């Protein structure tokens, strides 16, 4: 079981579910099933549409660098962003993720409104743990509650390892 998990793991940048501000730096920790050990991250706003991120994991697994760019704003509550990332892990990868964010209409007094998002990710692993290349595509959903807590769930599928039509087939034989 651990071998199956280890062969499939990769690392992804944590999303900062707010619009960037020039010169503002945010810091936090992310916990994931992929990395086991928490990863510390930093995000710095370059302007009102772009920020750059750095992640540091021990032992380097989960580390990486990424850049976010807001592509569209739809009023004060919705925006679309593109994230480009390089990740260091057993399956080091290049990621491209398209996010659609939506901020709640109102928040509790004195708190930040919650933000939810859906994302579409493409990932290229040039030299994975199994010594092969991999192209994965997936979908993810996330939500931030207030300023400190949030979650993200997703699925990335490697079409070379299993046909998409066989995901729910419990009798599928990879031979």
What do these predicted regions represent?
Residues 8-9, 65-70, 166-175:
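Outer-membrane beta-barrel "beta-signal"
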Residues 23-34, 46-60, 65-89, 113-128, ...:
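Transmembrane beta-strand segments that form the barrel wall of outer-membrane beta-barrel proteins
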Residues 1-5:
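Sec-dependent N-terminal signal peptides
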Residues 35-39:
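Beta-strand-rich domains and repeat architectures in extracellular enzymes and scaffolds
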Residues 40-42, 64-67, 95-98:
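A short acidic, amphipathic alpha-helical/loop segment
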Residues 15, 20, 89-175:
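Outer-membrane beta-barrel transmembrane domain signature
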Residues 6-26:
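Bacterial Sec signal peptide processing site at the extreme N-terminus
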């Amino acid at each position: 079981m651990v071998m199956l998990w280890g062969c499939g793991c990769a690392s992804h940048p944590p999303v900062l579910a707010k619009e960037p501000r020039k010169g503002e730096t945010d810091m936090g920790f992310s916990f994931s099933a992929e990395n086991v050990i928490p990863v510390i991250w930093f995000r710095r706003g370059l302007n009102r549409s772009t920020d750059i991120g750095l992640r540091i994991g021990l032992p380097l697994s989960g580390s990486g660098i990424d850049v976010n760019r807001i592509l569209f704003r739809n009023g004060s509550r919705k925006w679309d962003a593109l994230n480009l990332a390089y990740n260091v892990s057993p399956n080091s990868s290049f990621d491209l993720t398209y996010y659609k964010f939506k901020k709640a209409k109102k928040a509790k007094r004195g708190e930040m409104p919650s933000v939810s998002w859906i994302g579409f990710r493409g990932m290229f692993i040039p030299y994975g743990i199994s010594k092969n290349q991999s192209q994965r595509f997936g979908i993810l959903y996330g939500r931030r509650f207030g300023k400190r807590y949030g979650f993200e769930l997703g699925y990335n599928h490697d079409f070379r390892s299993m046909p998409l039509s066989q995901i729910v087939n419990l009798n599928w034989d990879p031979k």
